[in-house]
């Protein structure tokens, strides 16, 4: 395949297999960037060649790249490549949104990579406030670019999570308890993405606004709290640990039996343990990261207990993996070494992690390199699993073999190097070496930091050999005979539900490898361009807020132009009204090419759309919960005892305008609901008329809010953290009202063109009810002050 063909496929494709391969390539590029920053860290701690600013920049980028832009894209890449093949789906549920999700991540990686060129990013991957919001140490725009990059990454991950949940629940051709274990692993990961990412997005929005606009969400002097950032971040951060490791566990569960040539031992227990891990990780485990920040014994006990409990399902997996190996005929190949090393390193990570639920020990170790060592044991284990999968599926992807002897050499060097690095860090931490220091504070730690640096060199050599083995395999590898490279059929093990017709299953190929993939009739690469241009929204507002208004407006208009052209060209231009559309109150009697879906399929699509909208609403509930919960946090003397008194409670008039507008908005759910009921009975005409009434009431509400903000509100967001939350939360709700109106307008225009919006009717109605329900909470909190 030549370069021109590769670029064309990359820009136009919506095929999950192709998108998955692009995720993997992006993850490998990010791995190189993250590794360069790791080398800078080791150089500073070994030879003191950097200044403090450059060192902390490297620490920040290394952590952010490895977590957000290496492990997550690689896991998502394997999910795109494998899940449809494993469950018999022809693609993901939303192929176009899948492509959009990938292309949103590309500018995120670019912005994060160039961020130190535009200002200091001395944050750490956890970006704690107030360091992340002040502009003296972290001067320039670098930190803003990091925040924008991670907002884009979070939105991409949320869309991906909903897409995979819908794909697995609606398109699988195998029963749940027959699904491959990797599918189970990523299914639970997708649910955690939906739950965890919105709180990080909320925190990043607060930090973005505080840096650029002076809204004091985290400023104690004005009623804010730096601990609020920790709550929001770690509510995301600990589920994120399992977002990282559950796909790796799934790959190990999937591939270990192939290498042991026997069925997995304890399939049901492993599948259910994934659910248990996901459930426990979202309960209260995140607060064990904050034992030194929370002075509440009950909270510490609950968090400690749930943290200990999560070891049980993890132990179930390890026992079953070990039993699988015990009864198998193990093939000592490159993937085998990496998969077994995963188990060993995961155990070491678990053993070092056992100390942290014990509050007194956590107090002693929390600020030391022992935490860094523990985390590296876990992340290195994840890396082994991902590389093991890469080597296992390489013959399927390329149709060629690699040099397995060299592969095993590289794998052994990688494992030895990573073990030395993580162990050196852990010993230094046990001896008390503090983390986040640019200079080693005592010579007692030198041998162990040197040990970590030697390990890093071995790790680099191992990765270099493994990369060379794969590159050599692509160009000079021996061809695979048949379509079962690992001879799994002979032991009745199955790699895919969609069996390959021929190899390779490479870029631009169909799921079975039989033919080159088409582009779904796309004449312009809308989803790649839209994904790239989405970054223009936060970038545009950034330029506006720093005073470069023309640049900001140009960026915003560029995105709007592409979006409007896409909507017209893809959704309205090709549509021709059918000759007979309505009869007897709006029942459709004939269909055009654009409306060829049968009523039975239309009803089925409505059921699917309801599930999809409810998953989106779950993410939205977490987002609004982060905003409203953040307000409750800074206003409470229990959670913000030192600075809650510095808040100025927004004095907002309830009568007459806000009360009237609230009544209008809440009443708009009535015509919306009746419209939906008419639609289900086939009366599209009444659906249209009542939908227009709903829109009119929504527009009236927005108009009333604009008038309220310009005539009734006499305070500004910068007055206090409370006023910042008022403006941020009410504006967020207003944005969602606009989104709801856009969906309704879209439905009305499609109906006018003669299209029956089966799925769209569900999306418009359910989402509008959600927007109205959220306003009840917002109005009660900020206008009636019933919650705080």
UniProtKB/Swiss-Prot annotation:
It is an enzyme of class 1 (oxidoreductase). GO terms for cellular component: plasma membrane. This is Quinol oxidase subunit 1/3. GO terms for molecular function: cytochrome-c oxidase activity; heme binding; metal ion binding. The gene is soxM. Heme a3 binds at residue 374. It catalyses: 2 a quinol + O2 = 2 a quinone + 2 H2O. It holds the Pfam family COX1.
């Amino acid at each position: 395949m030549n370069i021109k063909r590769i670029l064309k496929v990359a820009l136009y494709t919506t095929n999950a297999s192709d998108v998955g391969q692009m995720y993997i390539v992006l993850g490998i590029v990010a791995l190189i960037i993250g590794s360069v920053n790791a080398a800078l860290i080791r150089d500073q701690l070994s030879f003191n060649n950097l200044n403090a600013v450059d060192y902390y920049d490297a620490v920040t980028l290394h952590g952010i790249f490895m977590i957000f832009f290496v492990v997550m894209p690689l896991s998502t890449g394997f999910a795109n490549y494998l899940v449809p093949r494993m469950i018999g789906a022809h693609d993901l549920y939303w192929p176009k949104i899948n492509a959009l999700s990938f292309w949103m991540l590309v500018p995120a990686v670019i912005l994060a990579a160039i961020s130190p060129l535009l200002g200091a990013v001395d944050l750490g991957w956890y970006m704690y406030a107030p360091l992340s919001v002040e502009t003296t140490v972290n001067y320039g725009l670098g930190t803003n670019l990091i925040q924008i990059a991670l907002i884009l990454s979070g939105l991409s991950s949320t869309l991906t999570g909903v897409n995979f949940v819908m794909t697995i629940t609606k398109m699988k051709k195998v029963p749940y308890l027959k699904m491959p274990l990797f599918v189970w692993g990523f299914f639970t990961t997708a649910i955690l993405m939906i739950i965890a990412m919105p709180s990080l997005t909320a925190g990043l929005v607060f930090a973005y606004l505080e840096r650029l606009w002076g809204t004091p969400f985290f400023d104690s002097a004005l009623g804010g709290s730096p601990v609020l950032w920790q709550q929001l971040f770690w509510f995301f951060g600990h589920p994120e640990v399992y977002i990282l490791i559950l796909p790796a566990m799934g790959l190990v569960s999937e591939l270990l039996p192939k290498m042991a040539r026997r069925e997995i031992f304890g399939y049901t227990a492993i599948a259910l343990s994934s659910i248990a891990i996901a459930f426990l990780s979202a309960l209260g485990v995140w607060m064990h990261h904050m034992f030194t920040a929370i002075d509440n014994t009950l909270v510490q006990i609950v968090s400690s207990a749930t943290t200990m409990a999560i070891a049980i399902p993890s132990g179930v997996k390890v026992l079953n993996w070990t039993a699988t190996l015990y009864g198998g005929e193990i093939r000592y190949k490159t993937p085998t070494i990496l998969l077994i090393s995963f188990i060993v390193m995961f155990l070491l990570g678990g053993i070092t992690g056992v100390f942290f639920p014990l509050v007194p020990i956590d107090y002693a170790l929390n600020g030391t390199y022992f935490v860094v060592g523990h985390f590296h044991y876990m992340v290195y284990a994840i890396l082994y699993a991902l590389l093991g999968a890469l080597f296992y599926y390489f013959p399927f992807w390329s149709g060629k073999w690699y040099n397995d002897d060299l592969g095993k050499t590289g794998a052994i060097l990688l494992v030895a190097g990573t073990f030395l690095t993580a162990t050196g860090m852990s010993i230094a931490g046990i001896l008390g070496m503090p983390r986040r220091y640019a200079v080693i504070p005592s010579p007692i730690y030198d041998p162990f930091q040197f040990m970590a640096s030697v390990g890093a060199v071995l790790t680099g050599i191992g990765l270099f050999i493994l990369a060379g083995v794969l590159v050599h395999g692509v160009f000079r590898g021996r061809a695979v005979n048949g379509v079962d490279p690992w001879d799994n059929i002979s032991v009745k093990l199955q790699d895919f539900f969609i069996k390959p017709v021929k190899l390779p299953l490479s870029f631009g190929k169909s799921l079975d490898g039989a033919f080159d993939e088409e582009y779904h009739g796309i004449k312009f690469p809308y989803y790649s361009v839209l994904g790239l241009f989405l970054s223009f929204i936060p970038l545009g507002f950034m330029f506006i807020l720093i005073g470069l208004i023309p640049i900001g407006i140009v960026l915003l208009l560029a995105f709007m132009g592409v979006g409007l052209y896409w909507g017209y060209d893809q959704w309205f231009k090709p549509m021709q009204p059918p000759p007979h559309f309505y009869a007897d109150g709006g029942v459709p009697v004939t269909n055009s090419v654009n409306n060829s879906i049968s009523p039975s399929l239309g009803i089925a699509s409505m059921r699917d759309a309801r599930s999809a909208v409810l998953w989106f609403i779950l993410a939205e509930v977490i987002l609004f919960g982060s905003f409203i919960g953040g307000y409750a946090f800074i206003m409470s003397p229990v959670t913000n005892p030192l600075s809650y008194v510095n808040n100025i409670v927004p004095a907002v008039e309830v009568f007459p305008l806000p009360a009237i507008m609230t009544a209008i908005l809440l009443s708009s759910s009535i015509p919306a609901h009746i419209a939906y009921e008419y639609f289900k009975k086939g009366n599209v005409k009444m659906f249209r008329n009542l939908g227009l009434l709903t829109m009119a009431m929504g527009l009236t509400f927005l108009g009333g809010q604009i008038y309220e903000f310009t005539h009734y509100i006499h305070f500004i967001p910068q007055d206090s953290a409370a006023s910042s939350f008022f403006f941020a939360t009410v504006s967020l709700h207003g944005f969602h009202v606009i989104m709801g109106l856009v969906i309704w307008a879209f439905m009305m225009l499609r109906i006018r063109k003669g299209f029956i919006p089966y799925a769209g009717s569900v999306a418009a109605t359910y989402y509008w009810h959600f927007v109205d329900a959220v306003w009840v909470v917002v109005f009660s909190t900020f206008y009636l002050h019933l919650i705080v």
